[in-house]
Every structure is written in C-alpha cells, then in structure tokens.
Swiss-Prot record:
L-tyrosine binds at residues 35, 168, 172. This is Tyrosine--tRNA ligase. The keyword RNA-binding applies. GO terms for cellular component: cytosol. Belongs to the class-I aminoacyl-tRNA synthetase family. TyrS type 1 subfamily. It comes from Treponema denticola (strain ATCC 35405 / DSM 14222 / CIP 103919 / JCM 8153 / KCTC 15104).
Length: 406
C-alpha cells in the first residue's frame, strides 16, 4: 500500500474508499491533489471536525497537495447529512465571518505544512449559478431514486427533508467537478457521513468525461461508551478560545476514558505509533496527560498547553502553578457576613444556575479547599481563605475554580 495511505490506515482513519488499491497505485506514481471541505455554519470548528484536517496534514507531510474548501456557497443551503432537522439559516454576512474565522483556525493548525495547502470558497462558483443551466448540465446526471437510497436522505425522509437540502448533494458533487477541472483534484476526503455525496461527485466527474477520481472517508469517531466524541457536559469542544478555554480543552482530553487513549493519540497527535504504544503501555494517567498536552499544543500552541498542564497539576495534585488554573475574582466584602454556598458556586461559574448549584451541593459534589460542603444553607466566610485571600472550589470530580477575593 502507498506510504501515505498506510499511515492513515495504521492510525485508524480509513473507513471506506471507492477503490483503495487503485488510489494506492495512483499515489505511488507521484503527488496527488486532494481536497476536504467544511461548511462555515458556526464561528468555530469543534474537535469532531478535525479528523479530516489531521488526515490532510498527514497527506501534506508525505508531499501531496491539499485544498481546503470552505463552503460559503453550500452553507447557504445546509447539508442534511447526520441531521434530524433543517439547519437554521444564517445571513450571508454571518457565513462570510464564520468562513474567515474557520480558515484562520485551520491555517494556525497547519503551521509549516500550509505551504502544501490552498484555500478556496465554493461561493465563488455557486453564488451566481444559472439555475436552468445547472439543471440541464448537472441535474440531468442525477437519479432521484439513487439519491434517496443514501442513508442521509433516508433518515431525513422520515422527519421531513426540504427541497432546499435535497439540492445539497448536487452542489457538493459540482464542487468536486469544479476542483477537478480547475485544480486537477483527484481525491476527496471527509467524514463517513459524506460518503453518498462524495460517491455522487465521483460519478458526476466520470459522466462529464473526466478521468478516474477517488473518494476516501474516515470513521466518525466515537468514545468507548458509544457517544460521539467532541462533546462534553457543557457542549461541543470548540477550537475558539472564546468558546472553550485552553484549560477546559486540555481537561476534555485529560478526562478521556482509559479505553480511548491510544485511539485518540493515533488520530489526534503526530507521535509515532511506536511512541504511542510505549506511552499507553505505562501509567494510564500519564498517558492521558500526554494526550491532553499534545492535542492542546497542536491546537492552541505549546505555551497554552504548558499553562493548562500546570493548572491541572495545581488543581488535582497540589503541584504545578495556581496561576494557570481557571480563576474568578470576587469581592472580599461578600465574605464579611458570609456568602451562601449556592450563590458562591453560581457566581464562580461552576453552576449555570442557582438550581444547578443547589443540586450540586445536595448530591455531595461541592467542595471548598477539598472539604465537602453538603449543607445548602451553609454560609462561607473568611475562615476558608488561605494566606493569599484565595480558595479552591471543586464541582464534582474534575471541575475546579480558583477564587481570588479582593
């Protein structure tokens, strides 16, 4: 098998390919141009979006040429794949802002490998399409019966599929055709939920007289408990630091289940397979810490990863640097007559509402300086402060907040 494909296969990326042997043979002959796409339906990617981007970086490191297609055109419609209902329609200005933000995130991640990557936006060729010409030239090559056989459409037919979304496959296929004609793209990569759209694009190129092209999909990553990875109790694990802090990002990976550590290291780091196996054969908590550090460094930079590591060590083991912990500032005057435990945890951001804070205390999950507080009427005063006028709050097993009173 071709070296680049073997890397992806050994690290657990590959799910399906239109013709893996033929693709391998083609890549053995020399550099291949390939693309992956992402729709800017939000201001930030989350970690679940990153599997194709990690694969792109692997391929670029092996000398192949990548294109990242930002779907400024397709996002005006919305992809029904994996969705149970129609997406909220965003304004064109919102989509343009999101596209710029997502491109910056990917550029930062690619770092020096960006020299092998081009960014394009499909609104450049989709925004002003003539509908009649498009139906004649492109729509005539699609079978509605075949489209409805794909899982993405079958699922949505049960809950309601708009005609708007039904057009998405034609537009994504047209993207592949345009990239093939203009940039000699021969390979499309993406998540396995895109399989139907990718195969349709390959078929369109063949029907339009193009050469052989390929579709390669990657597994949709799940955790050991069967849940889709990339989510936490607070929601998606976004790359944008305004949405998820580097510390919380680090903690998501640090809290990986034992059974997932090696799999996630293979997919979300560039450590060698030999080193990964060696790390995972040792202390599992050290392996989790290494996983968290490596992924955080790749996404947010080494400096932020080191801060997050120090903060985690300060919170969990009493070592490290307290300054790197998540920190909130409250007025010292709140402690003069005592602040209620429920108010304290709510104001510290460890509970989204006072009702949540109350439940936390009642269920035995509220700690101050590692002392459990189970009385919902407890008043917290200055006796809980350390010499620096600080206290450490803990919610449950893994969420900490350093409170500075001034």
């Amino acid at each position: 098998m071709n070296k680049a494909l073997k890397i992806l296969q050994e690290r657990g990326f590959i799910q399906q390919c239109t013709d893996l042997q033929a693709l391998s043979d083609r890549m053995d002959k020399g550099q291949i141009a390939f693309y992956t796409g992402t729709d800017p339906t939000g201001p930030s990617l989350h970690i679940g979006h990153m599997v194709p981007i990690f694969a792109l970086k692997h391929l670029c490191r092996e000398g192949h040429k990548g294109v990242v297609l930002v779907g400024g055109g397709t996002s005006r419609i919305g992809d029904p794949s994996g969705k149970t209902e129609m997406r909220k329609m965003l304004s064109y200005d919102e989509l343009d802002k999101n596209a710029a933000s997502i491109q910056k995130q990917i550029e930062k991640f690619l770092a020096k490998d960006i020299k092998n990557v081009r960014f394009v936006n499909n609104k450049d060729w989709l925004a002003d399409l003539n509908y009649i010409d498009f139906l004649r030239d492109i729509g005539s090559h699609f079978s509605v019966n075949k489209m409805l056989s794909f899982e993405a459409y079958k699922k949505r037919m049960e809950t309601g599929l708009s005609f708007l979304e039904f057009n998405y496959q034609l537009l994504q296929s047209y993207d592949f055709l345009m990239l093939n004609q203009n940039y000699n793209i021969e390979l499309q990569i993406g998540g396995d939920d895109q399989w139907g759209n990718m195969v349709a694009g390959s078929d369109l190129i063949r029907r339009k007289g193009g050469g052989e092209v390929f579709a390669l999909t990657f597994s949709l990553v799940t955790r050991a408990d069967g849940q889709k990875m990339g989510k936490s109790e607070k929601g998606a694990i976004f790359l944008d630091t305004a949405l998820v802090s580097p510390y919380d990002f680090f903690q998501y990976w640090r809290n990986t289940a034992d059974a997932d550590v090696e799999k996630f290291m293979l997919l979300f780091t560039f450590l060698s397979i030999e080193e990964i196996k060696s790390v995972c054969a040792g202390d599992i908590n050290k392996a989790k810490e290494r996983l968290a550090f490596e992924v955080t460094a790749l996404i947010h930079g080494k400096e932020e990863a080191e801060k997050a590591l120090e903060g985690a060590r300060a919170a969990f083991s009493g070592g490290g640097n307290k300054d790197a912990m998540p920190t909130a500032n409250l007025s010292l005057s709140k402690l003069n007559e005592g602040i209620g435990i429920i108010d304290l945890f709510a104001e510290a951001g460890l509970a989204s509402t006072k009702s949540d804070a109350r439940r936390l205390v009642e269920q035995g999950g509220a700690f101050i300086n590692e002392e459990k507080i189970s009385d919902i009427k407890a008043l917290i005063g200055k006796e809980k402060l350390d010499k620096d006028n600080e206290m450490i709050l803990r919610a449950g097993k893994k969420r900490f907040m350093r409170i500075i009173f001034s």
